[in-house]
Amino acid sequence: MLMRKTLLLALLVLLSLGLALLVLEWVYRAQLVDTYRPELHTFNPGQVIAPDGKPALLVIGDSFTAGRTSYAGILQDTLQEWRVINAAVSGTGVLQALYMAPHRFAQFHPAIFLYQAYVGNDLFDIRYPTNWRTTSPGRNIYWFLANHLRVVGYLNYRLRQVGERLTSNQRQALSPRVATAATATADPTTAFAVEHYDARVKIYVRAEPSLLEDSILVQGSRRHDYAIFLEKLAQLLAYCQQEVCRAYILVIPHICQVDEAYLTYMGQLGARFTTPAAMRLSEYPFLVGLRARFTSWSHVHIVNPLAMLREMHRQQAVYYANDEHLNPGGQQALAAWLAQQLRLQ
């Protein structure tokens, strides 16, 4: 009898949690509450958000774009004749951009819409893999749930922020000597090292060693994910009406496409490349597919900074050594290049 009551209670708890998640999923996807409003107000000064008669340039993207020190933040400071609205959110992809688009377009009515894509993990965001041999059970269960309930990823994002704030507060409470040591330990090194590379990237390539190559070359199981990506991107770009708005898709390349040494380095992290020479292509399948999909959309333009980043990298590094993101020099170069490509100066 006791066992039966326990099982019944457990079932009721699971049903309650499941129902709560379904309700949260509906609220999240429909954005009945603007769940990314905090980022909008963090990355944009009040005078930028408020209408002032200037045309608006709306930028949506992931961690390459989010933040005041990104190329979008730099454009905010340099393009005096435009309201540059940075609506990017770290860890998001085209699915999340599609969720937040109705709010952003209704609020800002952009004359230009820039969507930043990243070839390195945009298809990963469409479908998280499961790999029970190289990835922990907890991670596999999380990815399985996140594939079907997108609010799970959002909740994880918010919980991670809470954890980072708590860690930051604890460091501030340390003695000056210990705090200085903690800060020094967190600083990125100037040379690649497996032990220092971004842990998240190492988890991704262990779970799916062919992720980078399959994404860049649109092959294997990622071919289907790319088709979904294009479909969702078309839905997103439909908010940019041709009569009043022109759109740009900025495709950020992976560092291994800019610096060939990172083909070897990514291999040390667990990535697999069967055709490494294809990583040198300037017009690679991920990019070519975008051009083909939107060739009839006269107000949509694909911008490819790969050649510029390669040229800049010959002079100085444009990516961090142990992180897949652009460093401050890379962000500055991208901002200057974009201002020309978007015909803003």
Language-model features: locations:
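Histidine-centered active-site loop/cap adjacent to the catalytic His
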Residues: 24, 320-345
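Short, solvent-exposed loop/turn segments at secondary-structure junctions
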Residues: 64-66, 90-92, 118-122, 253-258, ...
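Short, amphipathic alpha-helical "lid/cap" segments that border enzyme active or binding sites
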Residues: 94, 98, 226, 230, ...
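Serine-dependent acyl-ester chemistry module
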Residues: 120-291, 310
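Structural recognition of alpha->loop->beta junctions
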Residues: 286-302
